[in-house]
Amino acid sequence: CSMWDAIYDCLFFCINQDIYDSLTPEQQQVVDEAGQKAVEYERYINRSGDEEIMSRWEKSNGVTFTKKEDMDIDSFKKAVDGIDDWFVNELKSAGYDDAQDLVDLFTEDSVDTVEDYSDLNWPETTWNFACSTTETSTWADGGRKFGELMEKATGGKVKVNIYAADQLTNGNQSEGIQALMNGDPVQISMHSNLIYSAFDPRFNVVSLPFIYDSYDDADAKFDGEAGDKLKEILNGYGLHCMGIAENGFRELTNSKHEVKSVDDMKNLKVRVAGSNLLMECYKRWGADATNMNWSETYTALQQNTVEGEENPLPAIDAASVQEVQPYCSMWDAIYDCLFFCINQDVYDALTPEQQAVVDECGQKAVEYERYINRSSDDEIKARWADKNGVTFTEKADMDIDSFKEAVDGVDEWFVQELKDQGYDDGQDLVDLFTK
């Protein structure tokens, strides 16, 4: 038996879509949670049996095992060099035009691979990952990717449990961040800058309106000097930021009518994230803005307590909000990021070499989350339009200037708000994101 680890296959654990759709969103969340736990259990028992099987085969059947390190693996790799290109052409010939994107997801070093660092004397430990959104969200997927990479890098010594919807703090997002700062019961989390603003209003700078031209522009800022400044602030709260992931452009949905100009926003009851900056922006746009936990929003929209909300499409989709929101304005007005952090004490307990591995896995998970978050928009829009009858108003069909004019000067308002609260670096922060 040659233990070469050349080819892998997975198991899709699926439920019929019609059966799933017949459940309430709350019931769907329970099904997803139970399903993910069953998947994690199956992975564990599948992987943990190899050593026992090998020992039994040797004793009972006289099987000779050839380990990977004793094989000329490069000779096998060279023999199949270029098979990725063959596969892409095969798919294209069959009419599948997304083949290269699929291959890139599984083969790019930035997404799915990490070296074996199991010789670094890792402690056997389990870290709890928390995020505000559901099990099926890109946030949770980012946490799962980090867990997969860490388990692979450490030879299974470090494992990561996923707790979506801030389960460990009863759905309270701010308490989820506080639990991370305490290091118990959360050691790792992915939370929005808007939620962090409850602890430090400077994090609102990320979400000043209309300051990003594109996703590339956002990446350049978060991977550059602006992102470094945010990481420095996080460090002051006992957190080490492994990378800055993405919630994305917060599109506006509502149940009343199309929103094309600022006049359409007048008195619209909109749930916004817990941020003074967002509240100020929506006030200037004429909306009746209110704050509530994301976990409470679907019911509030269903009962018409609020008429609209604003979030990136993947986050809206993961919570099935499109079921009660027939209008969506794709205005790209406000963007928010996700801080992918580990408790500083947990991080400091590692050796410098181990810390480097954690940072590598963290950055790969961030890049993965960004990719899947962005690549899903077109599919989501097509499905919402077909299945839920959602009407989309594109940015090109909106009077964007009317929205910009309404929030003209909000940068200066924000800097003054920070000064009033004792933060003198507000203008420098704004300049990092707007110059």
Positions of PLM-derived features:
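N-terminal secretory/targeting leader peptides
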Residues: C1-D217, K229-K435
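Signature of the catalytic double-stranded beta-helix
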Residues: F222-D228
